[in-house]
UniProtKB/Swiss-Prot annotation:
A lipid is attached at G2 (N-myristoyl glycine). This is Protein Nef. Residues 69-78 are annotated as: SH3-binding. HIV-1 lineages are divided in three main groups, M (for Major), O (for Outlier), and N (for New, or Non-M, Non-O). The vast majority of strains found worldwide belong to the group M. Group O seems to be endemic to and largely confined to Cameroon and neighboring countries in West Central Africa, where these viruses represent a small minority of HIV-1 strains. The group N is represented by a limited number of isolates from Cameroonian persons. The group M is further subdivided in 9 clades or subtypes (A to D, F to H, J and K). GO terms for biological process: symbiont-mediated suppression of host antigen processing and presentation of peptide antigen via MHC class I; symbiont-mediated suppression of host antigen processing and presentation of peptide antigen via MHC class II; symbiont-mediated suppression of host autophagy. Residues 148-180 are annotated as: Binding to ATP6V1H. The record marks M20 as: Might play a role in AP-1 recruitment to the Nef-MHC-I complex. A motif (Diacidic) lies at residues 174-175. InterPro entries: HIV-1_Nef_anchor_sf (IPR027480), HIV-1_Nef_core_sf (IPR027481), HIV_Nef (IPR001558). Induction: Expressed early in the viral replication cycle. It comes from Human immunodeficiency virus type 1 group M subtype B (isolate Lai) (HIV-1). A motif (Dileucine internalization motif) lies at residues 164-165. Belongs to the lentivirus primate group Nef protein family. One of its GO terms (molecular function) is GTP binding.
């Protein structure tokens, strides 16, 4: 009656199949690579460093050896709604991002840390493009980017102790709108996908 692989009683297979069936879907708003991970369980040939900016960025980070000297400690997976909410609250409890001035370099460091420790591909932390408050495209991520008042930026840059390369001193050079932004926790973003309402095209 068939080979040993034709039987459903292969040790452990029913548990693996059930685990695959119960895998959480990727959160709304994640990138193409995370969609591949959700659908196929791996990065497909349609997403390479040549065709996908997130893959190219990650490859460059690994080649430069900046950031973290370790390889991912867990399997690669897409960011899910539950994981985004949990990560947001974890960072809030640890006091990690609240009020921290945003820069692309700081976002890259956060993405690399999460990639290496949690296995989430770094294409999930994207924000709406307009000036003003930037809302996360990934549903469940509870940090939005809020412009810092110009007088606070000027106050931070007064005196002799100003650090020229600190993100607040760069006056928004990383930002297309030239705004100085800070991460701000907003628990309502776990229940209300503002980015989807403002930009249904994403």
């Amino acid at each position: 009656m068939g080979g040993k692989w034709s039987k459903s009683s292969v040790v452990g297979w029913p548990a693996v199949r059930e685990r695959m069936r119960r895998a959480e879907p990727a959160a709304d708003g994640v990138g193409a690579v995370s969609r591949d991970l959700e659908k196929h369980g791996a990065i497909t040939s349609s997403n390479t460093a040549a065709t996908n900016a997130d893959c190219a960025w990650l490859e460059a980070q690994e080649e430069e050896e900046v950031g973290f000297p370790v390889t991912p400690q867990v399997p690669l997976r897409p960011m899910t709604y539950k994981a985004a909410v949990d990560l947001s609250h974890f960072l809030k409890e640890k006091g990690g991002l609240e009020g921290l001035i945003h820069s692309q370099r700081r976002q890259d460091i956060l993405d690399l840390w999460i990639y290496h420790t949690q296995g989430y591909f770094p294409d999930w932390q994207n924000y709406t493009p307009e000036p003003g408050v930037r809302y996360p495209l990934t549903f469940g991520w509870c940090y939005k980017l809020v412009p810092v008042e110009p007088d606070k930026v000027e106050e931070a840059n007064k005196g002799e102790n100003t650090r020229l390369l600190h993100p607040v001193s760069l006056h928004g050079m990383d930002d297309p709108e030239r705004e100085v932004l800070e991460w701000r926790f907003d628990s309502r973003l776990a229940f209300h996908h503002v980015a989807r309402e403002l930009h249904p095209e994403y």
